[in-house]
Amino acid sequence: MTRPRVSIVVPVFNKARFLPAALDSIVAAVRAYGDAELIVVDHGSTDGSRDLVASRYQPIARILDWKGGTIAAVRNHGVHAASGEVLSFIDADCTIPLDYFGSLADVLATSGAMATGAEVVPPSSPSWVEEVWYRLHRRARDGEQEWIGSANLAVVRAAFDAVGGFDERLVTGEDTEFCQRLRDRGYRIYESKRLTAVHLDNAKTVGSFYRKEVWRGLGMFGTVRPGAIDKPTVMTVVHLVLLAAGILALAVAGWAWPVRLVVAAGLVVAAPAAALLYRAAAGGDLGRPLRALLLYEVYFVARGAAMARLLFRGVRG
């Protein structure tokens, strides 16, 4: 059986710290597979990322430049220069196994799917934030999925072209929206653990986790998003309402202070607790439930802060 030519698109923006590990693994996998091309698209890096790629990875890596726009536009720009039958999107802070592209070809051939990939996992010796958040959201088995993150996603070129690529209006969440359009066209998306990648640049502290979720929230809420409102958005609104109710509960004059505190605390943690139960029902690992509850509280506070910031901007402008 003839294996397809694979075009690997790696978007880069200020990832010099992680690029050597990421590109070393990708280059080794490209050489092991044979019929593949590596396209690195620099998004205006200022930390020497582009120079690092030019000095260490040419000519095997082809470097393109893209200024401004979104990460979706960066990936689409790489695709325009690609010649492969299969497009493999791998982020610049992810490492992959040596047999990755052989496994990719096998999965596409045997699953009948038009898109595949896998979740990204934290590195060895992760921080507790990385470990708890990953265990909550990891997928236990191979199988058909609604979406796969674009940090580690592959799609048949014909399907990519048929749905029009990534939506360049979206600052974040472009992968879920793209996968939705694939499924709307009847294309299957299949996850295989053989394609698992290691993500090096996770949030490692509660503070960095909060900042990253604020950024994601600004992107998710601040751009045009076709289709239905997703569960995180609904739960963020619910959390804001319950948070306000909790504050009001403290002001109820007829209640004793212990009662007020218990009611307020219950309202504040209601949405995070519901999210935790949902993850448990979906197979998530609740090995550290109090820490998991804390992260979900931080998650909803961060998303709520992003929503409030955007509303404030709208009122001002």
Give each language-model segment a name.
Residues 25, 42-51, 94:
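A conserved acidic beta->alpha catalytic loop
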Residues 121-124, 138-158, 171, 177, ...:
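A recurrent flexible, glycine/aromatic-enriched loop bordering the glycosyltransferase active site
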Residues 48, 92-107, 180:
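Acidic donor-binding/catalytic loop of UDP-sugar-dependent glycosyltransferases
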Residues 167-170, 176-228:
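Catalytic donor/gating beta->alpha subdomain of glycosyltransferases that bind UDP-sugars
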Residues 87:
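Short aromatic/hydrophobic "clamp" motif used to bind/position activated sugar donors
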Residues 98-128, 200:
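Conserved donor NDP-sugar-binding/catalytic core segment of glycosyltransferases
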Residues 15-30:
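Short, well-formed alpha-helical segments that are part of the catalytic scaffolds
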Residues 66-82, 147-150:
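Glycine-rich, basic loop-to-helix element that forms the pyrophosphate-binding segment
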